[in-house]
């Protein structure tokens, strides 16, 4: 129990920091788990991950409303609307977004838990069939083409991912193995550093921020329950779509709300909270990652030789409770903690954001240096080889950043390339 409490508290702390600081992406939670996955059982990995992503959305709105610094990417959709709100309206927003986030978080947790009771291999054995998996993965690959509408770059990323993904299946032709030798020694952690983390150093952060000290007291405005329910459902659905779940949910809820700027903001923040939880459903039900968070968790499961659709129903440390049971209970408890913390100490959060904002580059450089140092220490390759490969992936990542192209197709095919090639080869032999 002590370990469980420590994991939840650690997740809450990282979730708050991730939400308050725009330099830290939402996938930083599972990224941190690379350093501890060997000593943590599955329930602890899932709890930490889901607690962090939930907190990043809770506190992303706190950062945005108090200082106009988008604490997380999905907040960008309503940033300009804050200019048209009065002080009292912004005070009420802090309360209403917290309530909306709490309701959305609980509803999506219940949805995830109930859905997994029915959508699993025991009840639906066809989920493991080659036909179903081919259809599922093909739809996912096709949907990746529409993330940023950059079809050519997405296709190139998919091809690169296939070319360098680990090939352990000897049904694959020797050509794949020959291409792989060009990238001998890389790790998925290195790819994440290069294409996602290090490019954040090149992002320009707006230095003009506002910190209205009169926002330190929130106002308990009236909650529009219909709007909250609608946005929660939109977020649940958006969370099942491959791509940046939180941003997709925010944009969808924002654009379908026509009752004023304040309601649009509440809708966006409510939707993104439910989406970051339900995006776990494809991973836990089908072992199918659909965004950066779930891709990292999928890789962690591979490192621990876990098949998630069956592993979540095994007994946890709590005896009769399964891994899924203890995860759902812990996540629900953390949501109430987030609600309390996000409606108190507002002035402290705002001052923390302002004090760190001017040092954001230094903070990121320090974080990246530590991450590279630890990975280099554990890498099974030479320093020159490591730095060369990291430079290659970083160049790709910076290019994608400035071209506004998502690295998700590359990560998806690196993780699942071996399985995808095997599936398509089997399908070809069976049906042609």
Cite the ranges covered by each PLM segment.
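Membrane-interface alpha-helices at helix entry/exit sites of multi-pass transporters
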Residues: 42-47, 81-103, 258-268, 404-405
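Membrane-embedded alpha-helical modules
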Residues: 97-206, 305-432
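Short helix-coil transition sites and intra-membrane helix breaks within transmembrane domains
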Residues: 17-27, 65-76, 238-248, 268-273, ...
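Membrane-embedded alpha-helical segments of transport systems
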Residues: 54-59, 96-112, 266-306, 333-337, ...
């Amino acid at each position: 129990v002590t370990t469980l409490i420590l994991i939840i508290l650690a997740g809450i702390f990282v979730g708050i920091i991730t939400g308050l600081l725009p330099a830290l992406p939402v996938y930083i939670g599972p990224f941190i788990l690379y350093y501890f996955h060997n000593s943590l059982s599955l329930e602890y990995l899932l709890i930490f991950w889901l607690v962090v992503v939930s907190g990043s959305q809770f506190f992303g709105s706190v950062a945005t409303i108090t200082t106009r610094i988008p604490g997380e990417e999905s907040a960008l959709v309503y940033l300009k609307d804050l200019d048209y709100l009065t002080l009292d309206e912004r005070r009420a927003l802090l309360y209403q977004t917290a309530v909306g986030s709490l309701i959305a978080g609980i509803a999506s947790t219940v949805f995830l838990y109930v859905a997994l009771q029915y959508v699993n291999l025991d009840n639906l054995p066809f989920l493991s069939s080659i036909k179903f998996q081919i259809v599922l993965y093909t739809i996912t690959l096709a949907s990746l083409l529409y993330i940023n509408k950059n079809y050519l770059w997405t296709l190139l990323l998919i091809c690169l991912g296939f070319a360098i993904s680990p090939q352990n299946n000897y049904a694959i032709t020797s050509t794949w193995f020959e291409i792989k030798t060009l990238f001998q020694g890389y790790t998925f952690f290195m790819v994440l550093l290069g294409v996602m983390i290090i490019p954040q150093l090149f992002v320009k952060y707006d230095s003009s921020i506002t910190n209205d000290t009169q926002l330190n007291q929130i106002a308990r405005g009236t909650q529009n329950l219909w709007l909250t329910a609608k946005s929660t459902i939109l977020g649940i659905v958006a969370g099942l779509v491959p791509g940046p779940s939180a941003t997709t949910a925010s944009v969808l809820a924002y654009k379908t709300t026509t009752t004023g700027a304040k309601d649009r903001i509440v809708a966006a923040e409510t939707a993104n909270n439910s989406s970051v939880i339900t995006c776990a459903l494809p991973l836990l039900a089908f072992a199918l990652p659909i965004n950066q968070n779930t891709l990292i968790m999928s890789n962690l499961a591979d490192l621990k030789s876990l098949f998630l659709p069956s592993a979540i129903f095994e007994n946890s440390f709590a005896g009769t409770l399964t891994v899924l049971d203890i995860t759902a209970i812990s996540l629900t408890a953390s949501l109430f903690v987030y609600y309390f913390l996000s409606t108190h100490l507002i002035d402290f959060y705002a001052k923390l954001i302002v004090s760190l904002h001017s040092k954001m580059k230094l903070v990121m450089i320090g974080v990246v240096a530590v991450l590279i140092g630890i990975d280099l220490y554990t890498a099974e390759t030479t320093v020159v080889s490591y730095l060369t490969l990291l430079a290659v992936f970083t160049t790709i990542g910076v290019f994608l950043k400035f071209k506004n192209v998502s690295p998700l197709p590359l990560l998806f095919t690196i993780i699942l390339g071996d399985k995808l090639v095997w599936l398509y080869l089997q399908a070809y032999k069976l049906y042609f």
